[in-house]
Amino acid sequence: MFDSLEVIKENSHEDASLRLQELIGKFIQDDEKFSLGLSGGSTPRFFYQNFANTYQENSDISLWTIDDRHVPINDEISNQRMINEIFSKTKMKILELQFNENPNMSADEYSKLVLSNIQNFNCAILGVGDDGHIASLFPNTTAMNNKSIGFVANEVNILSKWRITSTFELLSNIENVYLLVTGENKSDILKEIGKDNELPVNQLIKHRKKTVLETDQKI
């Protein structure tokens, strides 16, 4: 296992989520700008709801979307839709990933929006897919080789043909990255995390000085 990977095990998904909020909360200071990258899926929802309740009055927090399926925001599989539903009633600034018919244009526009609003990428929460993908950086897809810091369109043909995703370089340059991987259904991929192989999650861990894995499973 990489020395740069710190593993924190809790007894349940809820405990792991609360511990994650405690860790991230240490970086949030009064009257200081703070940015948090958000992933989609059901795993982080409990964390998001608690985070929204705790920091609902904090207008210094900017939220950006790590990746999304290339679908309209009102689509039920849109990550941005879930983020908006949870955080829209808070004072936090949501940097919304807008849908454009051309996925490359969507990625370019979101790169400009995020990079013009965020000077320091403080924290981000990532899930890990059963195939080891992070964000929408799937194994053997072209986006894995993009060297820019920003967002790109990635053709994956999973649920939707295209995804808009943070680049590997952007994820590598975030100050604090947390992998939230919980549930018995993640036991197989958890056995692979931290190995020296070509899985996107392990490539990211290998290239970062530190990555934290929060889980409720044995590893």
Tell where the protein language model's regions lie, with residue ranges.
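N-terminal glycine-/serine-/threonine-rich phosphate-binding loop
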Residues: 1-36
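Ligand-binding beta-strand-loop-alpha-helix segment within the catalytic cores
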Residues: 1-4, 58-125
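Short, flexible loop segments at the rims of nucleotide/cofactor-binding pockets, characterized by
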Residues: 12-15, 101-104, 155-160
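Glycine-rich beta-strand-to-loop/alpha-helix junction loops that act as flexible
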Residues: 38-43, 51, 126-130, 182
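A glycine- and small-aliphatic-rich helix-loop capping segment at beta-alpha/alpha-beta transitions
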Residues: 50-58, 84, 139-147
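Short, conserved loop/helix-junction motifs that constitute active-site signature segments
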Residues: 54-62, 143, 169-175, 204-208
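ATP/nucleoside-binding phosphotransfer catalytic cores, i.e., glycine-rich phosphate-binding loops
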Residues: 173-219
